Amino acid sequence: MRNWELSVSPSFLELCDQYVSLCESPSFSGPSCLNDMAPDDILGNCDLFAEAADALFPDCLLEEVEAASGLAFETNEEVEGFVFPDCPERPGQECRSCKQHREMSGDPSILCSLCYMRLTACFVYSPVSDVEDEEPTEGVAENSLKRQADSSLCSSSPKRFC
């Protein structure tokens, strides 16, 4: 086996040292605030490129692309089919979201999540442990929903959740 030895001339090493010293960033002695970093006439500099940008991308071209891609707000099928939640005075009555859920499921007593939350609880969270003086509930009875909805604490605060 032969061993090869590469010898580098000192002038090459000096050039490398000079290059590294040029590439190193100098110590920071920056401006006192962010506004001093940008030139005052930055808007004037942007105006120089405005005509070129308009020539490259005219408004009529952008409108054609938007119409062809179906990204326009009016033609977006996902937005048209979406029912935005209501916040009726009486949860479950005259609520578009509840109506949509009832039509889709065929169950006339079903509620949307917002109306269900407003009927069954005053707050979004649930307690960590059960209250000892309440009777255990295996299922949610209809009269307990009405009783909770008629309580003074819940009836004074449903507007907070809308």
Swiss-Prot record:
Organism of origin: Tree shrew adenovirus serotype 1
GO BP: regulation of DNA-templated transcription; symbiont-mediated perturbation of host process
Keyword terms of this UniProt record: Early protein
Protein name (record): Early E1A 18 kDa protein
Polar residues bias (residue ranges): 150-162
Ion transport keyword on record: no
Region (Disordered): 134-162
InterPro entries associated with the record: Aden_E1A
